[in-house]
């Protein structure tokens, strides 16, 4: 068999795709990135949060210092409720002290620029290349896969990775090959999100986030450096939609929604209307919630938003995708080392991708489920979520934050690069290897805590007519 170097074709110049490019470079695997737009740094009005699980991998790749320069760390969150109660959560500060990395928000375009600028060979990035067809081929005793673009170009390689987002063409090709259908894409769209970036907003403190948890909606405002403010407003839709029937929104829809929260205070005598009036870019879309169980077939695999999609509240969408990259690259590196320069067969690649799917699915499912819970607590969906948000979080928040800390501590990383900041206590303290895998013990403590906590709440706050006022 020919000794031609193993090559990966990456569909999509996304955060996921560019992170994969950096990781492949580290292990000496040839690659090419195909992006359908005319730039890999488009302005979409979106911010992105980098949390410790994603930050650690980016730090391994030598990319995190540039992110730190752009994004002031979150130190606290001021959380407001409909009844006028508010409290300050130091969850972001405790996260940084535990894991060494803060919650850092920056423009998605800024992160894409950082990833692109740091690439050692930008000639591997091809814009204006829209995938048209994927074929398997045999040529001169060499087998592989090729991508044909609508522009008439042909790219050949051994593995095709779809990092092309929620509307993934690569995923569609996988479905076609396994005789599946779009009905298998069991995404639910129960919430919408209007998000934007405002500039020249004076009077707010960088790194002090503000959240309003209302009935059916959540407003989050994140002041950053240089008087830039990131914000998003999540709204519960009138019903649950499927992927194909989800509503589309206009700027008029965004304006109408945001006008309903103009009077909400952000701090220092600033209302949300003041932030809205300084907007630079605004967008609105429905939020998908999904986690596919099948990610690959043959020489094709999907990662990132093309296989798992979450709402913005937990901030794990990009971070989970970065973990996808780490798990896949660890397996690819091991395979290439075992082959000692001989290109793997299609059967060997297919087996590796199935192993990737099986190994990482439970982790992705865990994060997706936590994201689903978070958006519903923030939007106060139903009595239980309202009780947790209003009466458990303010008083027992430090106890219940152990669950997301457990999730962070069990994050994947690149196993061939030393771990930075591994001396921070949270990575070991909250790891499943340290705490064990038993779910019974946490439950034994959690249920009594909820019982006595809710009994205390009812005893203090219950009075005739109170429940009606609380639900309004």
From Swiss-Prot:
Record has Signal as a keyword: yes
Keyword Repeat listed: no
One GO term (biological process): terpenoid biosynthetic process
Signal peptide: 1-24
InterPro entries: FAD-bd (IPR002938), FAD/NAD-bd_sf (IPR036188), FAD_mOase_fung (IPR050562)
Family: Belongs to the paxM FAD-dependent monooxygenase family.
Protein's name in the database: FAD-dependent monooxygenase dpmaE
């Amino acid at each position: 068999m020919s000794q031609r170097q193993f090559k990966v074709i990456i569909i999509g110049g996304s955060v996921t795709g560019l992170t994969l490019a950096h990781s492949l470079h580290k292990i000496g695997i040839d690659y090419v990135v195909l992006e359908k737009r005319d730039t890999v740094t488009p302005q979409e009005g979106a911010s992105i949060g980098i949390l410790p699980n994603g930050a650690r991998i980016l730090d391994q790749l030598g990319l995190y210092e540039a992110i730190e320069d752009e994004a002031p760390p979150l130190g606290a969150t001021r959380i407001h409720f409909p009844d006028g109660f508010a409290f300050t959560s130091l969850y972001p500060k405790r996260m940084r002290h535990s894991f060494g990395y803060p919650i850092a928000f920056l423009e998605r375009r800024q992160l894409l620029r950082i990833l692109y600028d740091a690439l050692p060979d930008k000639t591997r990035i091809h814009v204006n290349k829209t995938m048209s067809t994927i074929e398997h081929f045999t040529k001169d005793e060499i087998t592989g896969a090729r991508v044909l673009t609508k522009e008439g170009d042909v790219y050949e390689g051994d593995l095709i990775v779809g990092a092309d987002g929620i509307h993934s063409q690569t995923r569609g090709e996988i479905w076609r090959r396994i005789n599946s259908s779009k009905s298998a894409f069991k995404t639910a769209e129960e919430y919408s999100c209007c998000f934007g970036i405002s500039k020249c907003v004076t009077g707010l403190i960088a790194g002090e986030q503000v959240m309003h948890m209302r009935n059916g909606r959540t407003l989050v405002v994140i002041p950053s450096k240089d008087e830039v403010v990131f914000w998003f407003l999540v709204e519960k839709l009138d019903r649950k939609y499927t992927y194909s029937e989800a509503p589309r929104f206009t700027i008029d829809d965004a304006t109408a929604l945001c006008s309903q929260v103009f009077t909400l205070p952000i701090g220092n005598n600033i209302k949300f209307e003041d932030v809205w009036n300084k907007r630079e870019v605004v967008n609105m879309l429905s939020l998908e919630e999904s986690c596919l169980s099948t990610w690959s077939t043959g020489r094709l695999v999907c990662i990132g938003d093309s296989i798992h999609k979450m709402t913005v509240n937990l901030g794990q969408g990009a971070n989970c995708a970065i973990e996808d990259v780490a798990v896949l690259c660890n397996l690819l590196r091991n395979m290439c080392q075992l082959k000692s320069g001989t290109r793997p067969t299609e059967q060997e690649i297919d087996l590796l991708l199935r192993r990737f799917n099986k190994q990482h699915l439970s982790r992705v499912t865990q994060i997706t489920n936590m994201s689903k819970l978070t958006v519903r607590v923030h939007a106060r969906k139903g009595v239980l979520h309202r009780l947790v948000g209003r009466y458990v979080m303010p008083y027992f928040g430090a106890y219940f934050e152990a669950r997301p800390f457990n999730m962070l501590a069990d994050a994947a990383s690149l196993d061939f690069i030393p771990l930075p900041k591994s001396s921070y206590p949270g990575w070991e303290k909250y790891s499943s290897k340290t705490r064990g895998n038993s779910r019974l013990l946490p439950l034994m403590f959690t249920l009594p805590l909820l019982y006595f906590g809710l009994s205390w709440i009812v005893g203090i706050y219950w009075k005739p007519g109170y429940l009606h006022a609380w639900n309004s």
